[in-house]
Amino acid sequence: MPRLLRYGSFSVVASVLGASYYYYAVASPLYTEAEWHRVSQRTAALIDRRIDIPVPESTTERREYVVRSSKETMKDIWNEQIRSIVDWIYSWSH
């Protein structure tokens, strides 16, 4: 008898938890409007090849890149920070 009662109570608790999960998470608009649900659906569609992966268009415009050493870059960052600190200090005097 205790074994039957234990299995019966486990079944009832599992059924109640399953039903509450279904009605709260799956059947309600909270589930279908959630951001993680949209991401999950989009990921599944990408995997199943139902939608295409967006590819940015390439341009044929010429671009100029300036390559500098990390030493010069650090000096520029340092100077910018010093200038902003000095501006902040002088802003208190006005």
UniProtKB/Swiss-Prot annotation:
Coiled coil: which residue ranges? none
Name its GO BP terms in alphabetical order. Answer: cristae formation
Question: The organism sits in which domain of life?
Answer: Eukaryota
Keyword Cytoplasm tagged: no
Which Pfam family, any one, appears in the UniProt record? AIM5
Tell me which InterPro entries the record gives: Mic12
Which UniProt keywords are present, listed alphabetically? Membrane, Mitochondrion, Mitochondrion inner membrane, Transmembrane, Transmembrane helix
Name one cellular component (GO) term. Answer: MICOS complex
Task: From the record, give the transmembrane residue ranges.
Answer: 7-23
Q: Where is this gene product found?
A: Mitochondrion inner membrane
Q: Mainly localized where?
A: mitochondrion
Q: How does it sit in the membrane?
A: Single-pass membrane protein
Subunit organization: Component of the mitochondrial contact site and cristae organizing system (MICOS) complex.
Q: What does this protein do?
A: Component of the MICOS complex, a large protein complex of the mitochondrial inner membrane that plays crucial roles in the maintenance of crista junctions, inner membrane architecture, and formation of contact sites to the outer membrane.
Q: Name the family the entry cites.
A: Belongs to the MICOS complex subunit Mic12 family.
Q: What is this protein called?
A: MICOS complex subunit MIC12
Organism, scientific name: Eremothecium gossypii (strain ATCC 10895 / CBS 109.51 / FGSC 9923 / NRRL Y-1056)
